[in-house]
Curated annotation (Swiss-Prot):
<dbReference type="GO" id="GO:0005737">
    <property type="term" value="C:cytoplasm"/>
</dbReference>
<keyword id="KW-0456">Lyase</keyword>
<keyword id="KW-0963">Cytoplasm</keyword>
<dbReference type="InterPro" id="IPR013785">
    <property type="entry name" value="Aldolase_TIM"/>
</dbReference>
<comment type="similarity">
    <text>Belongs to the HisA/HisF family.</text>
</comment>
<dbReference type="Pfam" id="PF00977">
    <property type="entry name" value="His_biosynth"/>
</dbReference>
<dbReference type="GO" id="GO:0000105">
    <property type="term" value="P:L-histidine biosynthetic process"/>
</dbReference>
<keyword id="KW-0028">Amino-acid biosynthesis</keyword>
<comment type="pathway">
    <text>Amino-acid biosynthesis; L-histidine biosynthesis; L-histidine from 5-phospho-alpha-D-ribose 1-diphosphate: step 5/9.</text>
</comment>
<dbReference type="GO" id="GO:0000107">
    <property type="term" value="F:imidazoleglycerol-phosphate synthase activity"/>
</dbReference>
<feature type="active site">
    <location>
        <position position="130"/>
    </location>
</feature>
<keyword id="KW-0368">Histidine biosynthesis</keyword>
<comment type="subunit">
    <text>Heterodimer of HisH and HisF.</text>
</comment>
<dbReference type="InterPro" id="IPR050064">
    <property type="entry name" value="IGPS_HisA/HisF"/>
</dbReference>
<dbReference type="GO" id="GO:0016829">
    <property type="term" value="F:lyase activity"/>
</dbReference>
<dbReference type="InterPro" id="IPR006062">
    <property type="entry name" value="His_biosynth"/>
</dbReference>
<comment type="function">
    <text>IGPS catalyzes the conversion of PRFAR and glutamine to IGP, AICAR and glutamate. The HisF subunit catalyzes the cyclization activity that produces IGP and AICAR from PRFAR using the ammonia provided by the HisH subunit.</text>
</comment>
Length: 258
């Protein structure tokens, strides 16, 4: 059995790490490189960086900090933000990123997933999915351009259909960003995760809602996700990564101990 992964998420805007609630009202958390270094030292299994306004601004992720992060950490990291071409991806990987993640650009051009997978291998192609639960219809819908709330739009894709589509096109991993839970620390949406797990045959990462160590345990035990991503509980030092891993190990979760 592969070890489960604990993944801090760093949302980047204007060269700094920020955090919002339900993808809105972002506050500045701190500088990118020191935070990355801290999380690596605390025992994170990998890091994910989202340049949250790159796609909505029509630009690619700011590469200047990618190489600086690569210099100070010795764990894998993934970078996302406006990657719309093989050339964009090649540059980011050449600066030291281990994986690239695409989200809004994949919705605009699904063939991008296949082209990236063919060029670089499925192992480094992650597809992020921003999913919103509509209580009126009882359905999960995929949103696009979520880094800028004024430009966010609901797509025609229902979440489960898009999960299946991106796998057919070559996604090597899926990060499910559950927008309703984002930043509120009430726990992951286990019902949604279980439904996605049934149709997801590549590594699945849960994102949005972690507030306690028990929430991580529930995601691993009840929804069988491969990794759990979180931001505010780590940024605000509500949960220490090494203590979280010790707790999960004590509960029988296969985890890499620091």
């Amino acid at each position: 059995m592969l070890a489960k992964r604990i993944i801090p998420c760093l949302d980047v805007r204007d060269g700094q790490v920020v955090k919002g609630v339900q993808f809105r009202n972002h506050e500045i958390i701190g500088d990118i490189v020191p935070l990355a270094k801290r999380y690596a030292e605390e025992g994170a299994d990998e890091l994910v960086f989202y340049d949250i306004t790159a796609s909505s601004d029509g630009r690619v992720v700011d590469k200047s900090w990618v190489s600086r992060v690569a210099e100070v950490i010795d764990i894998p990291f993934c970078v996302a933000g406006g990657i719309k071409s093989l050339e964009d991806a090649a540059k980011i990987l050449s600066f030291g990123a281990d994986k690239i993640s695409i989200n809004s650009p994949a919705l605009a051009d699904p063939t991008l997933i296949t082209r990236l997978a063919d060029r670089f291998g499925v192992q480094c192609i992650v597809v992020g999915i921003d999913t919103w639960y509509d209580a009126e219809t009882g359905k999960y819908h995929v949103n696009q351009y979520t880094g800028d709330e004024s430009r966010t739009r609901v797509t025609q894709w229902e979440t489960l259909d898009w999960v299946e589509e991106v796998q057919k096109r070559g996604a090597g991993e899926i990060v499910l960003n559950m927008m309703n839970q984002d930043g509120v620390r009430n726990g992951y949406d286990l019902d949604q995760l279980k439904k996605v797990r049934e149709v997801c045959h590549v590594p699945l990462i849960a994102s949005g809602g972690a507030g306690t160590m028990e929430h991580f345990l529930e995601a691993f035990r009840d929804a069988d996700v491969d990794g759990a991503l979180a931001a505010s509980v780590f940024h605000k030092q509500i949960i220490n990564i090494s203590e979280l891993k010790a707790y999960l190990a004590s509960q029988g979760v296969e985890i890499r101990i620091c």
